Amino acid sequence: MEVNILAFIATALFILVPTAFLLIIYVKTVSQSVE
């Protein structure tokens, strides 16, 4: 179970980090378009 939990955390970070990075770029692009 411990290994599965660590794998789940690693996978979650691997997915969330790039997603958050893309969201930040998207928000910046939209804000610039509105202006």
Curated annotation (Swiss-Prot):
The GO cellular component terms are: chloroplast thylakoid membrane; photosystem II
| Pfam families, sorted | PsbM (PF05151)
Keywords (A to Z) from UniProt: Chloroplast, Membrane, Photosynthesis, Photosystem II, Plastid, Reaction center, Thylakoid, Transmembrane, Transmembrane helix
- Residues spanning the membrane: 5-25
Q: Which GO biological process categories is it annotated with?
A: photosynthesis, light reaction
Localization recorded for this chain is: Plastid, Chloroplast thylakoid membrane
Major location (coarse): plastid
How is the protein disposed in the membrane? Single-pass membrane protein
* Family annotation (HAMAP family): PSII_PsbM
Quaternary state and interactors: PSII is composed of 1 copy each of membrane proteins PsbA, PsbB, PsbC, PsbD, PsbE, PsbF, PsbH, PsbI, PsbJ, PsbK, PsbL, PsbM, PsbT, PsbX, PsbY, PsbZ, Psb30/Ycf12, at least 3 peripheral proteins of the oxygen-evolving complex and a large number of cofactors. It forms dimeric complexes.
Cited NCBIfam families: PS_II_psbM
Q: Which family does it belong to?
A: Belongs to the PsbM family.
The task this protein performs is described as: One of the components of the core complex of photosystem II (PSII). PSII is a light-driven water:plastoquinone oxidoreductase that uses light energy to abstract electrons from H(2)O, generating O(2) and a proton gradient subsequently used for ATP formation. It consists of a core antenna complex that captures photons, and an electron transfer chain that converts photonic excitation into a charge separation. This subunit is found at the monomer-monomer interface.
UniProt-recorded name of the protein: Photosystem II reaction center protein M
The protein's organism comes out as: Amborella trichopoda
